[in-house]
Amino acid sequence: MSYSAGEARGQILDDVAEATDQLALALASLGEAYEELDVQTADALEEQLFRPVQSAYGRLRRTHAGFAERHGFPVREFAPSSGGLHSADPRVYVDRAVDAIERADHALAELQDSMLPVEVGDRELRAGLSETRSTIAELPARARRLMRVQGR
């Protein structure tokens, strides 16, 4: 199947936006979990999960905006997300965050595997995708460890 460079770049932007939206959901969910935790666990959640997700989210937003600008596409504004239905159990929110982080990582992995970033992307795009994936790679395991301790 053939495609134009413009169509392929549009697909890249759509895929990056999907992953960015998932990280926004993870941030919102972690924020909700923070409110339901004791101070010590909340501080650990902030340090081990929230800050890295926030960093990855910011990096991916900048990657999206920069790629769009460099190739003449409109820059998208990303809206904050909701943590979902309220729960008094912080593990529910952390599970939602983990699911969202894993969906973001999967979307970025599929994009990288498609070779579009190599064929029609640029160095800055590839660096942003790689840095984001490196930042979020260990977060699901960290979240599970943190919640295992919380459940005791």
Describe the role of every protein-language-model region.
Residues 1-57:
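Leu/Val/Ala/Ile-rich N-terminal alpha-helices, chiefly Sec-type signal peptides and the beginnings
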Residues 3-7, 76-89, 113-125:
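Short, charged/polar, low-complexity loop and linker segments
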Residues 31-39, 71, 79, 151:
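Extended alpha-helical coiled-coil "stalk/arm" regions that scaffold and mediate dimerization/assembly
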Residues 51-73:
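Conserved alpha-helical segments that form or flank metal/cofactor-binding pockets of metalloenzymes
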Residues 68-71, 75, 143, 147:
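A taxonomically broad motif for mature regions of secreted/extracellular
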Residues 90-95:
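Short, charge/polar-rich alpha-helical segments
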Residues 100-103, 107-152:
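Preference for long, well-ordered alpha-helical segments
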